[in-house]
Design a protein with these regions (language model features):
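DEDD superfamily 3′-5′ metal-dependent exonuclease/proofreading module
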Residues: 1-204
Length: 204
């Protein structure tokens, strides 16, 4: 496993020619309040890039080009949050997207455990540690444990998508999943605009 650490942006996009797995680390769970600290990406070849985002930085041309490339699928787990913080920070909408959490909810209806750790354990037989999830991602220097954790969140998303796609096809829910994925950028905008805790489709 190769992990490359960068500051401010990806140096280039040479490794990213197909679908890309993406995750983010922030100072908290409120996109309108808490800043983006790290963007981690994996091209699906067993390697990962961990990009530290300095406070106040909003100009990452290679990252923004990748996020907005209509020909490259972006794979997230809980894309709703990541899309919101990326939009808040860089002012761009990431499309097209795939969310493994939504795919899990549409297929693994026999359980309420849809966290990445639980899905990877059951679907792929892979154990990942979440010990560093609640740590100071805004630190000037990340620890080796933080870097390894960040990479682990994206290294398996391509394989997980493949397996969840098989389950979506088996259950006849592919079109429903695709419709959900298309709506995600708008859902992220609603969250940032003040409707994060409200179901606008509810009767009351």
């Amino acid at each position: 496993m190769t992990i490359r650490l960068h500051r401010g942006d990806l140096p280039d996009l040479a490794r990213y020619q197909g679908a890309v797995a993406i995750d983010t680390e922030t100072m908290g769970l409120q996109p309108a309040r808490d800043r983006l600290c790290v963007v981690q990406l994996a091209p699906g070849d067993g390697s990962a890039d961990v990009v530290q985002i300095p406070q106040g930085a909003a100009d990452a041309p290679n990252l923004k080009a990748l996020l907005t490339d209509a020909n490259r699928l972006k794979i997230f787990h809980f894309a709703r949050f990541d899309l919101a913080i990326l939009l808040q920070t860089f002012g761009v909408k990431a499309t097209p997207v795939y969310c493994t959490k939504i795919a899990s909810r549409l297929t693994r209806t026999y359980t309420d455990k849809h966290g990445l750790k639980d899905i990877l354990r059951e679907v792929l037989g892979i154990e990942v540690s979440k010990q560093q999830q609640l740590s100071d991602w805004g630190a000037e220097k990340l620890t080796d444990a933080q870097i390894a954790y960040a990479a682990s969140d994206v290294l398996h998303l391509h394989a997980l998508k493949t397996r969840l796609d098989e389950m979506l096809a088996r259950e006849g829910r592919e079109r429903l999943a695709e419709a959900c994925f298309r709506f995600l950028p708008a859902r992220a905008e609603l969250d940032l605009a003040g409707w994060a805790g409200e179901d606008i489709f509810a009767h009351s």
